[in-house]
């Protein structure tokens, strides 16, 4: 499973196919999703709980997540080990290897800030990627492309919790 550290996200979600693969079971739940023009739509989901660990075992936390179909769409995971040789500040960073699935399955957001905060940042020149060590391990901010003109867009969906 690949996690996406997303400070703009306010709830934890996990792709439902991963939930099924891991045989995680939870309680049914209904979420109200804010969509365009002030409209809302109901989303049937489950609330599941599991233990998340850093790869080195130094951090461990039980988290509750809502299941959904492709929460990040088809957002591909960047294997920074393939790109780090382009920038001197990244060359000695031991980035984690992505999981076997090429997409991000679990956005971890502001509701779990203890997993997101920066223990150490390694920066280069203005516009270059920044390596960030978090309690879960190393990640990188920025584009893996040398051209800073390459545009990247990420979408965040806002969800309200509706108690059932």
Model-derived segments and spans:
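Intrinsically disordered, low-complexity regulatory segments at domain boundaries
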Residues: 7, 39-45, 49-164
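Hydrophobic "anchor" residues on beta-strands that sit immediately upstream
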Residues: 2
